[in-house]
C-alpha cells in the first residue's frame, strides 16, 4: 500500500503524532457529548424545557454522526483523507462556537445535530486512515490504546461536567471543546499521512450507490456492523439516560452521579489494556469470544437485579461494569474483522459500518428513553439485555467460518 507506515518497532514520532492528534479530536467530540450530559439538566432549565430533552440532545448528536457518513468515506477515497479530515475538525470548531447563540431548546438541539456531523469524520475518514497505515497486530494495539485515551471522555466527562455546572456556565464547555479540536487540527495538518488509493477518480451517485450495494450484499460485513451497534448500544444508552436515572430517578447528587460512571468506564479501559497485552499472543477470534462472556453476564446481572428491585442501581452499575470490560476486550478486534470482511475501499466500508451503527444508536437511545419512562430501571436493562442477545446471535453468523480471525496475521 502507498504511504504505508513502518511497523510497530520502527514507528517514529511523526508516525505516532497522527494517531495521537486523531484521538485528541476524537476526545474533543466525545467529551462534547459526555461532559454536557450532566449539564443538560441546567440547559433544559434555562430554556424552560422538559427533562425528556436530556437524552434527545444525545440522540440529535448521534443522528448528526450518521448524516454524512455515506458521502465522506467515498469522498475521502477520491480527493484524499487529509483534506476531508481537516475540514471536519474545522466544522466541529465552528459549530461548537455557534451553539453559544442558541435562543431556545430547539435551536440548541439543531446545533447539537450539526455538531454531531463531526463524528462522521472519525470513522469514515480518520480510522480508515489508521487501518490503512498500520499492520494488523500493530493496528489493533494502537486502536485499543487510542480507545483508552478516548474513553477518558466518558470517565472524566460526567465528573468534570457535574463540577463545572456548579461554578461555570454550561456555554463555557463548548469553548473548551473548540479549543481542544483546534489543537488537534494543527497536529493533523502536520502529521496525517495520505492513504487514499482512488484519488482522482470521479465521484458519481450511481457509482456510489453501486459501491454501497456491493458492501451491503456482504452478509458477513452486515452481521459484524450490526453486532458492533447492538453491543455498544447499552453503553450509549447509559450515557444518555444516566443523568435522569441517577439524579432524577434515584435522587442522588450530581457528584454521586459522576462517581457511578467511574467503575463502568474504568472497566472499559481495563478491557482495552488487557486486549493490548493479549493481541500478540491470541487470535482476534479468541479475543472476541473471550470478551463475549463478561458482555452477556454483565447485562444479565443488571437486568435481573433491576427487575427484582427497580432501585438496585448499585447492582445495575456492577453489571454494566462487567459488560463494559467485555466490550473493551472484544470490540477493537471485531471492528478490524468487520472492516476487512469486504474488499471494497476502506472509506466506503468504514462509512457503511458507521451508518449502520449510528442508525442503531439513534433509534436505540430513543427506545431506551421510553423504556425507562414507562418501565423504570427494570425495562431499561431488559432492553439492554435484548441488545446483548442480538449481538450474540450475530456473532454466531459472523464467526461461522472457523478461519475468520483465526490467525495472528489476519
Curated annotation (Swiss-Prot):
Inhibited by CCCP. Pfam families: MFS_1 (PF07690). The keyword Heme does not apply. Coiled coil: none annotated. Its main location: membrane. One of its GO terms (biological process) is response to antibiotic. It comes from the Bacteria. The keyword rRNA-binding does not apply. GO terms for molecular function: potassium:proton antiporter activity; sodium:proton antiporter activity. It is found in: Cell inner membrane. Optimum pH is 6.5. Changing residue 26 to I/V: Slight decrease in chloramphenicol efflux activity. Exhibits low ethidium bromide efflux activity. It is a multi-pass membrane protein. A negative charge at position 26 is required for efficient transport of positively charged substrates, but not for neutral compounds. This negative charge does not play an essential role in the multidrug transport mechanism. This is Multidrug transporter MdfA. It comes from Escherichia coli (strain K12). The lineage of its organism: Bacteria, Pseudomonadati, Pseudomonadota, Gammaproteobacteria, Enterobacterales.
